[in-house]
A protein has these predicted regions:
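Bacterial Sec-dependent N-terminal signal peptides
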Residues: 1-28
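Compositionally biased intrinsically disordered regions enriched in Thr/Gly
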Residues: 20-295
Length: 295
């Protein structure tokens, strides 16, 4: 039987006040935290959704659900295949919606973690050179899988709202890894996802800015280097730094750029992240980005 530790079954509704001057209140936000565990896996899920109070918030909610579905239905595969179906129930019922994805994802992880553990135990049982003491110790040390999924709001203005999707997964290897969809910026005028903040064709003309940002990241982490040393250390082709797979997102008067693990650097170097002033990026912003930024 599964040991369950589910943090409140009902979603928490929270009012977020926008501006004290305007007296306007932002739409209701629904937050749900779920957790489940077995002997070989722990699953945690924290999701924040806008309540569907109007057309814009409903569209944003559906965009988040689509992204959540895309990630959780593929958590144990690198192929472009679904491991369980899209939720066809009422998308306005947050408990049922997220409960479905938690149950499906946890069931999938539980099955594969159990299979992995039994395979490891089988190898140990076949090793005639192991003492009983070592065998018992290694059985006790069988790795426990972990999966932590979060989708939370990280920024909002009257024109746009930014949500961030991030998940940590450990499947018994040397270390875990961080993946996810990254930042999703929605236009609040109608709730559509702004797919590109930076024009994807801007990679080459933006090289000096990307170099500047990365040199700043390494300097802040105690590593001083020049441009030549930087380019020689990165996992890039032809000396060209790519735009990050995660879309940059607005924060104040800047855009935040974050590279994922192994995207351009080693695991030990973390996830290079830096901010660049919007004013320096004007030639490279998409028309949609300029619209939500009021440019």
């Amino acid at each position: 039987m599964l040991n369950k530790a589910i943090v409140p079954a009902a979603a928490v509704l929270v009012f977020l006040a926008a501006s004290c001057n305007s007296g306007r209140k932002e739409p209701l936000v629904e937050k749900l935290s779920l957790e489940d565990t077995t002997k070989y896996v722990t699953f945690k899920m924290d999701v924040e959704l806008p309540a569907p109070v109007d057309a814009s918030s409903t569209a944003i909610r559906e965009g988040i659900i689509s992204s959540l579905d895309d990630q959780l239905t593929r958590i144990t595969t690198y192929e472009d295949e679904r491991m369980f179906p899209f939720y066809e129930g009422d998308h306005n019922d947050t408990d049922a919606l997220l409960g479905y994805y938690k149950d499906q994802a946890f069931s999938l992880l539980s099955k594969e973690a159990e299979e992995d553990a039994q395979e490891r135990i089988g190898y140990l049982m076949a090793d005639d050179e192991l003492s009983e003491e070592d065998f018992a110790r290694m059985i006790e040390e069988t790795p426990k899988w972990e999966y932590e999924y979060s989708f939370e709001k990280i920024g909002e203005t009257p024109s746009y709202v930014v949500y961030f999707s991030r998940n940590y997964i450990y499947m018994g290897g040397a270390h875990g890894g961080i993946t996810g969809a990254g930042a999703l910026t929605f236009d609040k005028s109608d709730g559509h996802l702004v797919e590109h903040i930076i024009d994807p064709s801007s990679t080459v003309p933006m090289q000096s800015l990307l170099v500047k940002g990365l040199l700043g990241y390494y300097s802040e982490n105690g590593v001083e280097m020049n441009e030549e040393e930087l380019l020689g250390s990165l996992f890039i082709e032809d000396g060209i730094i790519p735009l990050p797979g995660w879309e940059p997102y607005p924060e104040g008067d800047s855009l935040v750029f974050t590279y994922q693990q192994y995207e351009i650097a080693s695991y030990a170097e973390g996830m290079p992240s830096f901010q660049l002033p919007v004013n320096d990026l004007l030639p490279y912003l998409t028309s949609e980005a300029k619209a939500i930024l009021g440019l």
